[in-house]
Swiss-Prot record:
S-adenosyl-L-methionine binds at residues 197, 217, 226. This is 23S rRNA (guanosine-2'-O-)-methyltransferase RlmB. Keywords: Cytoplasm, Methyltransferase, rRNA processing, S-adenosyl-L-methionine, Transferase. It comes from the Bacteria. The gene is rlmB. It is found in: Cytoplasm. Gene3D superfamilies: 3.30.1330.30, 3.40.1280.10. Pfam families: SpoU_methylase, SpoU_sub_bind. GO terms for cellular component: cytosol. GO terms for molecular function: RNA binding; rRNA (guanosine-2'-O-)-methyltransferase activity. It catalyses: guanosine(2251) in 23S rRNA + S-adenosyl-L-methionine = 2'-O-methylguanosine(2251) in 23S rRNA + S-adenosyl-L-homocysteine + H(+). InterPro entries: 23S_rRNA_MeTrfase_RlmB, Alpha/beta_knot_MTases, Ribosomal_eL30-like_sf, rRNA_MeTrfase_TrmH, SpoU_MeTrfase, SpoU_subst-bd, tRNA_m1G_MTases_N.
């Protein structure tokens, strides 16, 4: 079993973080791209064979997605679970976690991973059910973050939140449009898990019930909500601002 990744950032990040899992690389024949050439040079330096193919072949392998002239077939990584999360948190003094409840669009998952990496999130937690997979699309949108931010899939999200609270003393903050306390009125400087719900539906009932606090993003215009990846960025960087203050 293998996975495909495509795009300059995604393949480059994979090469930097897990070169041993690269099976084969395909590149567009005759393409003169200053952004692509350093990656091709590094692949050559490491002795990784590149198969140069025409656009029709590469488009077909990338299933019509924008590939920027390169794609790779790779061995899938081991799926991380609750035990891996527990091990990770043992080495964290003031962890920041992102929890995505019911986010099923791989574009949104990739965008959230990219933002999580920029904000210093130590892991992203998702439920095994009703959650986007880490597809080639998600990896490309993540621009390399999918290879460095641990993605933890848990069987029971409510139970995981409870263990974060009781075992690791992490404050669980959920986002909800109707919450009276806003993001900017809330102290978010300690060990924290930020929970983002699906667009339109929000968090599931059990997830909401396991939050220590609910907060909202104040909205001044006529729209009632933001895209989940945009809302995630707004919340995470307010947390970053508070931690740097």
């Amino acid at each position: 079993m293998s996975e495909n990744i495509y795009g300059i950032h995604a393949v480059s990040a994979f090469l930097n973080n897990a070169p041993e899992r690269l099976i084969e690389v395909y590149a567009l024949k005759g393409r003169d791209d200053k952004r692509l050439q350093p990656l091709l040079n590094e692949l050559h330096r490491l002795g990784i064979t590149i198969q140069f193919v025409n656009r029709q072949t590469l488009d077909k392998k990338a299933e019509g997605e924008v590939h920027q002239g390169i794609m790779a077939r790779v061995q899938p990584a081991k799926e991380l679970n609750e035990a891996d999360l527990d091990t990770l948190l043992q080495n964290q003094s003031n962890p920041l976690l992102l929890v995505l409840d019911g986010v099923t669009d791989p574009h949104n998952l990739g965008a959230c991973l990219r933002t999580a990496d920029a904000a210093g999130v130590c892991a992203v937690i998702v439920p095994k059910d009703k959650s986007a997979q880490l597809t080639a699309i998600a990896r490309k949108v993540a621009c390399g973050a999918a290879e460095v931010v641990p993605l933890i899939r848990v069987t029971n999200l409510a139970r995981t939140l409870r263990e974060l609270q009781q075992k690791h003393n992490i404050w669980v903050v959920g986002t909800a449009g109707e919450a009276t306390n806003t993001l900017y009125q809330t102290q978010l400087t300690g060990g924290l898990a930020l929970v983002m719900g699906a667009e339109g539906e929000g968090m599931r009932r059990l997830t909401r019930e396991h939050c220590d606090q609910l907060i909202s993003i104040p909205m001044a215009g006529s729209v009632s909500s933001l895209n989940v990846s945009v809302a995630t960025g707004v919340c995470l960087f307010e947390i970053v601002r508070q931690r740097l203050a």
